Amino acid sequence: MGSTRIPLVKALHSPVSDYVNYDIIVRHYNYTGKLKISADKDNGIKLISVVFILICCFIILENIFVLLTIWKTKKFHRPMYYFIGNLALSDLLAGVAYTANLLLSGATTYKLTPAQWFLREGSMFVALSASVFSLLAIAIERYITMLKMKLHNGSNRFRSFLLISACWVISLILGGLPIMGWNCISTLPSCSTVLPLYHKHYILFCTTVFTLLLLSIVILYCRIYSLVRTRSRRLTFRKNISKASRSSEKSLALLKTVIIVLGVFIACWAPLFILLLLDVGCKVKTCDILFRTEYFLVLAVLNSGTNPIIYTLSNKEMRRAFVRIMSCCKCPSRDSASKFTRPIIAGMEFSRSKSDNSSHPQKDDGDNPETIMSSGNVNSSS
């Protein structure tokens, strides 16, 4: 009984001295076979790394402009835009973290202490986790809004900050678990090949969490589409042909947008999920694909580059503001300032009548068919 407990305790509670022992990095990389791979390829910074760094620089600049657009435009200081700003911040940090990861890779890896290595890899986990959790938070917010059929108010502001705070707290905990003890410093046979100081059980845990997040996002967006289709059928049943036709067009546009959102997300993240599952299942030095991690990871990072396009630039009002920021124009045009749009997902916005501004409760769905998600601009029905 005691003999089986000791390795478990060591795996969860590594001595403090292990975190500053330079030999541990070399030992673990040698055990997994990555030391030989690195030695064979180590001729300075690789061309592919330069390409990846340039991609990260684009992602960083792209998301900086999104944050500047939201900050400089007062009409965007609203709960839904907080989610978009939070997504841009996490994507920006993902670009920064991956750039730092690339610069500290290769021969530099063996000059790091385990504590520094955990910080290098953990920062990537935190940034990418925050990005995925932000996508989930946006989906939750849109679903709740669709259920209530109400636009944002004070209570929604509190809910927004609560969801955003939860994104970062959970991401920090998830990324910090290895440095807090869930690692394989003392148990080499349990080590991951992709991340040689990470325990395979931790890799499996993270993959499971991200897969559940993906499924949750898919379910929420499918539910949103279902709600829109239900309201469209109600209008058809009431023989309100013109409004039903408009609603059907919006439903089709919504379906296309949902396919884009989920398709891009799955295309970027699924390969990395599969690689990590292989890492958990494969024995050490048996799966050559595990030594090509950078190509799978850069796909996940690319999702941070597509998010601003899907969630921000597809909104016409934000696109105008974005262009103004890029052109260093300090005075927004009156024409664009007179309109106001509320992004939902990937260019989907609310359309509403003046009655939405009142304090009266929302009427039957059929009386306000414009209060649904669309793919166009917001046009007041008055």
UniProtKB/Swiss-Prot annotation:
The chain's Cytoplasmic topological domains, given as residue ranges, are 69-82, 139-160, 225-257, 311-382
Chain residues that bind sphing-4-enine 1-phosphate: R120, E121, F265, I266, A267, C268, W269
Q: Where is this region: Disordered?
A: 349-382
Where in the chain are disulfide-linked cysteines found?
C184-C191, C282-C287
Q: Where's it found, cell-wise?
A: Cell membrane; Endosome; Membrane raft
Transmembrane ranges, per UniProt, are: 47-68, 83-104, 117-138, 161-182, 197-224, 258-278, 290-310
Q: What is this protein called?
A: Sphingosine 1-phosphate receptor 1
Organism lineage: Eukaryota, Metazoa, Chordata, Craniata, Vertebrata
This protein's encoding gene = S1PR1
